[in-house]
């Protein structure tokens, strides 16, 4: 049995409906998309980064011990999944950027990919990441 950690990124949102939305109501639809899942909003997530379990643990161990960023990323082993949203971007971006100097080339590649995803969230606040531990 192999284990891995998958970072899935929000790729799009849509409302589950069969009828076309009248133009007059389109602003309500946009507002509903912005606030979340109250009107049948469906999030579509796509896998953007996959790490073997043991290598994920070694990667997050490069973050400063006791730091908020490390505690956040340790939520995956503790809870099985975490969500990374706009509120976590500055903290995680700074921590992973700082840790790159002590990382292996593979870890640096993952950090670069994660930093790119964090940049996407910074540019579009509705984007988020779901990070999950998966067992095959």
Curated annotation (Swiss-Prot):
* Superkingdom per UniProt: Bacteria
Gene Ontology terms: biological process: protein-containing complex assembly
Membrane-spanning parts: none
Family to which this protein belongs: To E.coli HyfJ.
What task does this protein carry out?
Seems to be required for the conversion of a precursor form of the large subunit of hydrogenlyase (HycE) into a mature form.
Protein name as it appears in the record: Formate hydrogenlyase maturation protein HycH
Organism classification: Bacteria, Pseudomonadati, Pseudomonadota, Gammaproteobacteria, Enterobacterales
